[in-house]
Amino acid sequence: MSGVNNTSANDLSTTESNSNSAVGAPSVKTEHGDSKDSLNLDATEAPIDLPQKPLSAYTTVAILCLMIAFGGFIFGWDTGTISGFVNLSDFIRRFGQKKTTRGLTTYRK
């Protein structure tokens, strides 16, 4: 640990940084005056208020969102119901294939 200096906070002093560092570089201003000072906005300018819409204006959007959400719910419900129905022993006994190792029929291939 010979490279580490154990100095207290009181012993630290400021030193001059490298002249090539980005911190010491002068600010760059163009001839058009692009600087932070040119971004001053008038404090007297009033903010623009958005028009307030009644809740009835959002009724159609709310109904459409509910219908879309309900459609996703029904899709999941339907898929779960059909999957459970196909696995019932009575359904397999009546409509199942006797040779299940064959896979799909030749009509579907």
Curated annotation (Swiss-Prot):
InterPro entries per the UniProt record, alphabetical: MFS_sugar_transport-like (IPR005828)
Residue numbers on the Extracellular membrane side: 78-109
Topology of this chain in the membrane: Single-pass membrane protein
Cytoplasmic side: 1-56
Feature: compositional bias, Basic and acidic residues: 29-39
Region (Disordered): 1-40
Main localisation: membrane
One GO location term (cellular component): plasma membrane
Compartment list: Cell membrane
Glycosylation sites: N87
Composition-biased stretches (Polar residues): 1-22
Residue intervals passing through the bilayer: 57-77
Keyword Transmembrane attached: yes
Keywords, ordered alphabetically: Cell membrane, Glycoprotein, Membrane, Repeat, Sugar transport, Transmembrane, Transmembrane helix, Transport
GO molecular function, one term: transmembrane transporter activity
Similarity comment: Belongs to the major facilitator superfamily. Sugar transporter (TC 2.A.1.1) family.
Described function: Probable glucose transporter.
Protein name per Swiss-Prot or TrEMBL: Putative transporter-like protein YIL171W
Organism encoding this protein: Saccharomyces cerevisiae (strain ATCC 204508 / S288c)
Source lineage: Eukaryota, Fungi, Dikarya, Ascomycota, Saccharomycotina
